[in-house]
């Protein structure tokens, strides 16, 4: 079921209360809901900075995806990334200023880690379900995340 808002730019889709992890989460049209957040995968290949900028322009509060537990990571892999040809996506975790001060672009606390070491931006290798540091200038697909 969905919201019948009259504004095309305010199209929202609310998940049925019977749909488990998506129950009661209202997201922009084309986005998927999980645990009070909305997610959307984009196949466009962009460097990290351009992908983050693109995400911030999609919806208020939207950034490159941040992951806070294995259940959320599994949701992204199974529900979102399955639409992408490449199993590698940008994540919002970075240290672009080389200060050893890792943080999510959405301001969330770094409370879950699954990475290999090197470079200043992170990709999520979905087939292996782990994160890898990589050069921020490379190009990858990405997932945007926004509060519902």
From Swiss-Prot:
Coiled coil: none annotated. SMART domains: CLECT. Its main location: secreted. It is found in: Secreted. Shows greater sequence similarity to the beta than alpha subunits compared to other heterodimer snaclecs. Pfam families: Lectin_C. Disulfide bonds join 27-38, 55-144, 121-136. Residues 34-145 form the C-type lectin domain. Keywords: Disulfide bond, Hemostasis impairing toxin, Secreted, Signal, Toxin. GO terms for molecular function: toxin activity. It comes from the Eukaryota. It comes from Echis carinatus sochureki. This is Snaclec 3. InterPro entries: C-type_lectin-like, C-type_lectin-like/link_sf, C-type_lectin/snaclec_domain, C-type_lectin_CS, CTDL_fold. Heterodimer; disulfide-linked. Belongs to the snaclec family. Residues 1-23 form the signal peptide. Interferes with one step of hemostasis (modulation of platelet aggregation, or coagulation cascade, for example).
């Amino acid at each position: 079921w969905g919201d019948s808002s009259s504004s095309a730019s305010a199209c929202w889709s609310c998940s049925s209360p019977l749909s488990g992890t998506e129950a009661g989460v209202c997201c922009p049209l084309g986005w998927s809901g999980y645990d009070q957040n909305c997610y959307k995968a984009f196949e466009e290949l962009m460097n990290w900075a351009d992908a983050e900028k693109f995400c911030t322009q999609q919806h208020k509060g939207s950034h490159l995806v941040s992951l806070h537990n294995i259940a959320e990571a599994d949701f992204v892999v199974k529900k979102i990334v399955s639409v992408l040809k490449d199993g590698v996506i940008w994540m919002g975790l970075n240290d672009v200023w080389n200060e050893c001060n890792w943080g999510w672009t959405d301001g969330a606390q770094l409370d879950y880690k699954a990475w290999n070491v090197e470079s200043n931006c992170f990709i999520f290798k979905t087939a292996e379900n782990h994160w890898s540091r990589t050069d921020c200038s490379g190009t990858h697909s990405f997932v945007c995340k926004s509060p519902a």
